[in-house]
Amino acid sequence: MLEHFCECYFNLSGLILCPVLGSIILLFIPNSRIRLIRLIGLCASLITFLYSLVLWIQFDSSTAKFQFVESLRWLPYENINFYLGIDGISLFFVILTTFLIPICILVGWSGMRSYGKEYIIAFLICEFLMIAVFCMLDLLLFYVFFESVLIPMFIIIGVWGSRQRKIKAAYQFFLYTLLGSLFMLLAILLILFQTGTTDLQILLTTEFSERRQIFLWIAFFASFAVKVPMVPVHIWLPEAHVEAPTAGSVILAGILLKFGTYGFLRFSIPMFPEATLCFTPFIYTLSAIAIIYTSLTTLRQIDLKKIIAYSSVAHMNLVTIGMFSLNIQGIGGSILLMLSHGLVSSALFLCVGVLYDRHKTRLVRYYGGLVSTMPNFSTIFFFFTLANMSLPGTSSFIGEFLILVGAFQRNSLVATLAALGMILGAAYSLWLYNRVVSGNLKPDFLHKFSDLNGREVFIFIPFLVGVVWMGVYPKVFLDCMHTSVSNLVQHGKFH
């Protein structure tokens, strides 16, 4: 009875509409009703999260087929539909999205009086668009939602950013990502003219010539590489992180950086397998250079957010190495590392936000000796520093381990360079923790710092649980994605 009820009333369109309905309700609430605005925004995001958990419970991990499929005709004169569905690859990205949005609303809880209801509406609309990206099975509509996310993120950075350069950072973020995606739009139009459809399921059975695959692969790569981001098109990310509010950085690191790698997994690799094999050495070279370069660059940074931002670039390029190993271990490890990065990097940005809220600076030189005045914060910061180093027992370890296993099967030199990047990652993580928490207490202002309050501790608890769960028992996550990953490898005949 309960199973039948869930099948009838829990679907992807309902999941997508939850944050939209919350936004519509907020439009009719005056800004003076701050408590009601907070409550409605938080309830809408929590309902969406619980909704996604119900879909996880209903998900059948034994099949590689898309599940909870819905289709609605969008353009009557073309085979373009509002086509939704998820599989083992996209399921956890949807859950990660719905998990982080309530956190973002709680982060801005105390500043809601100055932010206004528009702040919550922006994040709810962003959630709607991001869920649609991970659920969309129509190529053209995927592009529409893929690019539409830029609008609320542009507003979040440009309006609620923390410094004077926030407008420049917002425009840089917008233009970099938009210009890169124009090539993908041209490729989608070419596919539509050649095949008469943008339906992913049909396109997966369509065989393109090798020459056409190479052209289309390059066009998609131009879009996805900016989102990862890969070197040298990574310049927008550190600036966007520095200028974005704390919640904006959580969305950037936790979700938006996954768009590019998800795009590779969902479209580039299965649709253009011959071109993927052709360009794998190029991806390996670019990713290995990016890992070493950004890891060394991180050691030279003096801004806390830039350190974590460059660390994110290194981790996401490790993900691309795993994906393009084109085997089950590498791809499974890359998905697991993306989920882990969504938790760990978000938590680290929240830690920086805690410090910034208290002294309005992110420069490393102003901090030191916090263990004596903020022991609870220091403990939590230490835990997520260890997770960022991929300590065994934390969520990042098994993902990076599987990536190295997969990469060694494909190219031992690249795998060795990736392992070197992990060592550098441990170096800059420990350096950051030592500078901020250890040493002598700065007498000017740090003695005035208060430790974490109840709301901040409550925000960190779900991240602690998630990181430990994924680190201690990753089988739950790997089992759900295994069939879909195996099907991807077999479809491309990569094994």
Swiss-Prot record:
One of its GO terms (cellular component) is plastid. One of its GO terms (molecular function) is ubiquinone binding. The chain crosses the membrane at residues 9-29, 39-59, 89-109, 118-138, 173-193, 214-234, 245-265, 272-292, 335-355, 367-387, 413-433, 457-477. It is found in: Mitochondrion inner membrane. Pfam families: Proton_antipo_M. Its main location: mitochondrion. The keyword ATP-binding does not apply. It is a multi-pass membrane protein. The keyword NAD applies. GO terms for biological process: aerobic respiration; ATP synthesis coupled electron transport; electron transport coupled proton transport. Its EC number is 7.1.1.2. Keywords: Electron transport, Membrane, Mitochondrion, Mitochondrion inner membrane, NAD, Respiratory chain, Translocase, Transmembrane, Transmembrane helix, Transport, Ubiquinone. It is an enzyme of class 7 (translocase). It catalyses: a ubiquinone + NADH + 5 H(+)(in) = a ubiquinol + NAD(+) + 4 H(+)(out). Core subunit of the mitochondrial membrane respiratory chain NADH dehydrogenase (Complex I) that is believed to belong to the minimal assembly required for catalysis. Complex I functions in the transfer of electrons from NADH to the respiratory chain. The immediate electron acceptor for the enzyme is believed to be ubiquinone. Complex I is composed of at least 49 different subunits. A stretch of 270 kb of the mitochondrial genome is duplicated within the centromere of chromosome 2 resulting in the duplication of the gene. The expression of the duplicated gene (At2g07717) is not demonstrated. It is also probably not RNA edited and therefore differs in all the positions known to be edited. Belongs to the complex I subunit 4 family. This is NADH-ubiquinone oxidoreductase chain 4. The gene is ND4.
